[in-house]
């Protein structure tokens, strides 16, 4: 029996890649917080859901030219979902995903001496996650995740701070996570589109 789980191996691999990136390139790190103001979501297996999400991103920026940089980082996504009060079989769920981010940013358009326009785009791949669903008449848990996410943002950069308007999309499936509806087992998956404001700090 292996002493290291598959999830632990994925975490170790991601950490090693991030450490390697900091050694090979003269990189800078960025912390980004996302604040959704509008969301469209569909959660397979749930009925007329209420959803609350939060997300935190840590990126390493690797310059490839004066105005272009690659983005290699980590995103932590958390969601809490509940069936509407009118649902005949009420469930609630918690979803957590650890995602690897690969993208690029461009700051070649100067608006003033100190302010530049910033355009960012990235793709996110889940490397691990946990989810649980509780309710009547059944409950389930899962730790295996698959899917993909996309991020696109445009805004301004001033010194070490940037402010973006963003759009992002996620499609996440937790294997073996199910709910029971009218005696039939249904898979649970999260599909969401968000518009919002992003604040980043580079150090």
Task: Give the label of every model feature segment.
Residues 25-31, 54, 66-70, 98-100, ...:
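Outer-envelope beta-barrel architecture signal
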Residues 37-50, 75-98, 127-146, 173-190:
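Flexible, solvent-exposed loop segments that connect beta-strands
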Residues 29-35, 58, 70-74, 102-104, ...:
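Membrane-embedded beta-strand positions of outer-membrane beta-barrel proteins
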Residues 23-82, 200-202:
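Short glycine/proline- and aromatic-enriched beta-strand/turn motifs that initiate or cap beta-hairpins
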Residues 57-66, 104-112, 158-160, 201-203:
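Outer-membrane beta-barrel proteins
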Residues 51-57, 97-101, 145-151, 192-196:
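Transmembrane beta-barrel architecture of outer-membrane proteins
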Residues 33-41, 74-80, 106-108, 121-129, ...:
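Transmembrane beta-strands of outer-membrane beta-barrel pores
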Residues 83, 150-203:
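Predominantly the C-terminal beta-signal and adjacent terminal strand-loop region
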């Amino acid at each position: 029996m292996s002493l290291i789980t598959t999830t632990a191996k994925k975490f170790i691999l991601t950490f090693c890649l991030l450490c390697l990136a900091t050694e090979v390139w003269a990189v800078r790190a960025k912390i980004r917080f996302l604040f959704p103001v509008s969301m469209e979501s569909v959660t397979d297996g749930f009925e007329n859901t209420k959803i609350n999400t939060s997300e935190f991103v840590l990126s390493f920026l690797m310059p490839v030219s004066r105005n272009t940089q690659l983005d290699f980082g980590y995103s932590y996504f958390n969601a809490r979902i509940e069936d509407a009060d009118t649902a005949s079989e009420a469930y609630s769920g918690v979803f957590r995903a650890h995602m690897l981010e690969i993208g690029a940013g461009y700051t070649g358009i100067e608006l003033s001496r100190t302010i530049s326009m910033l355009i960012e785009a990235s793709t996110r791949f889940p490397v691990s996650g946990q989810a649980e669903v509780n309710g009547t008449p059944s409950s389930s848990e899962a730790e295996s995740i698959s899917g993909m996410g996309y991020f696109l943002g445009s805004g301004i950069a001033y010194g070490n701070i940037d402010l973006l308007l963003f759009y992002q999309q996620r499609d996440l499936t937790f294997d073996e996570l199910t709910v029971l509806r009218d005696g039939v087992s249904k898979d649970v998956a999260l599909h969401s589109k968000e518009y919002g404001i992003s604040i980043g700090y580079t150090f």
